[in-house]
Amino acid sequence: MQTLNTLDLQTTSLKIVNGQLWILDQQALPQRQEWLLADTVASLIEHIQALRVRGAPLIGLSASLLLALLAERGLSQALLEQALIALRESRPTAVNLMNNLARMQQALLQPNWVTAMAAEALRLVDEDRELCERIAQHGAALVKPGSNLLTHCNTGGLATAGIGTAIGVLLRAHQQGNLRQVWVDETRPLLQGGRLTAWELGELGIPYQLICDSMAASLMAQGQVDAIWVGADRIAANGDVANKIGTYSLAVLAHYHRIPFYVAAPHTTHDPDCPDGAAIPIEQRAASEVTGVSGGFGHCQWAPEDAAVYNPAFDVTPAALISGWVLDSGVITPEQVAAGFFQPHR
């Protein structure tokens, strides 16, 4: 029987070697491709909070795999329960982590909990890969021939077990010959667009141009953006979406310029217990991310040492600004959302 120790995950950003979890350091990309050991709860939490491992689906998968590996290593049920609690608190906004850990907790309660946790973790990886493919197929059907699309942050294989969410849509649209090019927001303050999405699109052979976040409005006014595609970290019961900071700005601009604004996400990003965007916890991050820059390219500070900084990692886009929620189950329309599609009874 195949165990986690012998498994080839076939993901871009996670691997298991000799029963230990390794992550691709996404803070070092694109200058360096470095793998970091994440074999303890403390080390994985540190990597998550430092954004060395990031992306709502991938965070949940990394936590699930580590728990299963720790179970195989002989960690007691009581200690695994403590690990679950600690991992759950590592990043508050992305709901995939909470959903995955809830499933791992159910596996932990089984009589054969070691085997059950390994099976559940592998199931989560396989499911995420399949969900990405379904999202890509549904989304690509919305892309018209010759489209110039704009995307924000990073939503590809680096952030998932599969081809990604919004980037998966771009990939399939490109393969179908309908994509002219992608405008890539650099995504301040941590430059996930400039560092990760630009690198990923280049690896996939998808034509793109990198822009500063503040250039998006000008491009829309010139008619050079046909649609905007973003991912999501949490979808509330009323359809509001939490995503990387700057997403809301794009949605407002798209609404003004009458450009379709699509959210691509798996159903695991939906939180039926969260009534609306106001109830979504928004992570606040360090001032140093705004006063300067660091990563694989070195460190530079441009703001005064004592500059006051406001640095939320996410913002909330109201459902009224979204043209469609592209899930693994299909494209959800504003009319369906208004009728209660995301409400708990569903």
Curated annotation (Swiss-Prot):
Pathway: Amino-acid biosynthesis; L-methionine biosynthesis via salvage pathway; L-methionine from S-methyl-5-thio-alpha-D-ribose 1-phosphate: step 1/6
Keywords: Amino-acid biosynthesis, Isomerase, Methionine biosynthesis
Pfam families according to UniProt: IF-2B
Protein's name according to its UniProt entry: Methylthioribose-1-phosphate isomerase
Active site: D233 (proton donor)
EC number: 5.3.1.23
Swiss-Prot/TrEMBL GO biological process terms: L-methionine salvage from methylthioadenosine
Organism: Yersinia pestis (strain Pestoides F)
Catalytic activity: 5-(methylsulfanyl)-alpha-D-ribose 1-phosphate = 5-(methylsulfanyl)-D-ribulose 1-phosphate
